[in-house]
UniProtKB/Swiss-Prot annotation:
Belongs to the OCC1 family. Signal peptide: none annotated. Residues 1-37 are annotated as: Disordered. Residues 1-10 have a biased composition (Polar residues). Pfam families: OCC1. This is Overexpressed in colon carcinoma 1 protein homolog.
């Protein structure tokens, strides 16, 4: 409710085999959530940020 996913899930569930559609929908939502932009606020980490964080963590561990 109040989520962008609720509309897509409701529309997909109304067609074909509910079990098969549900599995495919859950997988795609999971992937979308990793890259979703909620009202101008980016949710998730871009690959550059992940690389920076991992390099900083290595530096902290060495010192």
């Amino acid at each position: 409710m109040g989520c962008g996913n609720s509309t897509a899930t409701s529309a997909a569930a109304g067609r074909g085999k509910p079990g098969a559609v549900k599995d495919a929908t859950e997988d795609s939502i999971t992937e979308d959530d990793k890259r979703r932009n909620y009202g101008g606020v980016y949710v998730g980490l871009p690959s550059e940020a992940v690389n920076i964080a991992s390099s900083q963590a290595k530096t902290v561990q060495k010192s």
